[in-house]
Amino acid sequence: MPTINQLIRKGRLGLTHKKKVPALGESNPQRRGVCTKVYTTTPRKPNSALRKVARVKISGYGEVTAYIPGEGHNLQEHSVVLIRGGRVKDLPGVRYHIIRGALDLRGVQNRKKARSKYGVKKSG
């Protein structure tokens, strides 16, 4: 227990909060990485599916697990992708999303609605 004098001299340390997306660093909204493994995994209870995810190597950080949104994808090992923050609630440890339509990952085929989220250009 500190004395009043010690508190006056040094004060109390503030709480430091843990970053939700440490791989993006302080000021990067997105980072580029290389896929090391592309696979499917099952979500937590009570959901049931085969969710598509990829292990992505980010230079200067390490490997993270990122979710591949949308129906169908063309990712394989050594594909270069752009990741953003954003967790997947029913997949433990998945704290990043891969951006569709950027670098090696194509946009979703035949997508008509919410196109900008899935990297699809306006057709017609």
From Swiss-Prot:
Stored InterPro entries: NA-bd_OB-fold, Ribosomal_uS12, Ribosomal_uS12_bac
Transmembrane recorded as keyword: no
Any single Gene Ontology cellular-component annotation: small ribosomal subunit
CDD domains, per the entry: Ribosomal_S12
One function term, GO molecular function aspect: rRNA binding
Domain of life of the native organism: Bacteria
Gene3D superfamilies: Nucleic acid-binding proteins
GO annotation, biological process: translation
Keyword line: Methylation, Ribonucleoprotein, Ribosomal protein, RNA-binding, rRNA-binding, tRNA-binding
Positions of modified residues (3-methylthioaspartic acid): 90
Record function comment: With S4 and S5 plays an important role in translational accuracy.
Family: Belongs to the universal ribosomal protein uS12 family.
PANTHER family documented for this protein: 30S RIBOSOMAL PROTEIN S12 FAMILY MEMBER
HAMAP family for the chain: Ribosomal_uS12_B
Quaternary structure and interacting proteins, as annotated: Part of the 30S ribosomal subunit. Contacts proteins S8 and S17. May interact with IF1 in the 30S initiation complex.
Protein name: Small ribosomal subunit protein uS12
Species annotation: Wolbachia pipientis wMel
Encoding gene per record: rpsL
